[in-house]
């Protein structure tokens, strides 16, 4: 298992540390480190502290903050920035931009699992500027060009 440096900024995380929910889980659950419940009305967004700071340090890694599927499907709670990207040299607290795209007021409870953190490999590339590409089967075919279903 790859290891990264982490600071637990909220003392409650000592009893609820970031963890994988199962052996096959890709994401670590992030908790809402709030002092009191927050009401999120339809269409509103708010920044929720995770109580966690990470430093990936390795430029070959990045972390993504992703929504929890149940919150999105059942309550319309997704991320305000859709995907949060954390660079390897960032060392600050991880915040979650929470957006209520549902029709009902949603209450974010203190220490509720609000999002998930997935660490992924990153390949930094350089560009070769060209006038033309070598021909491929797809060419410039864009949206819908490979079929309907």
Swiss-Prot record:
InterPro entries: dUTPase, dUTPase-like, dUTPase-like_sf, dUTPase_trimeric. Substrate binds at residues 68-70, 81, 85-87. It holds the Pfam family dUTPase. GO terms for biological process: dUMP biosynthetic process; dUTP catabolic process. Pathway: Pyrimidine metabolism; dUMP biosynthesis; dUMP from dCTP (dUTP route): step 2/2. The keyword S-adenosyl-L-methionine does not apply. Keywords: Hydrolase, Magnesium, Metal-binding, Nucleotide metabolism. Its cofactor is Mg(2+). It catalyses: dUTP + H2O = dUMP + diphosphate + H(+). Its EC number is 3.6.1.23. It is an enzyme of class 3 (hydrolase). PANTHER family: DEOXYURIDINE 5'-TRIPHOSPHATE NUCLEOTIDOHYDROLASE. This enzyme is involved in nucleotide metabolism: it produces dUMP, the immediate precursor of thymidine nucleotides and it decreases the intracellular concentration of dUTP so that uracil cannot be incorporated into DNA. Belongs to the dUTPase family. This is Deoxyuridine 5'-triphosphate nucleotidohydrolase. It comes from Azoarcus sp. (strain BH72).
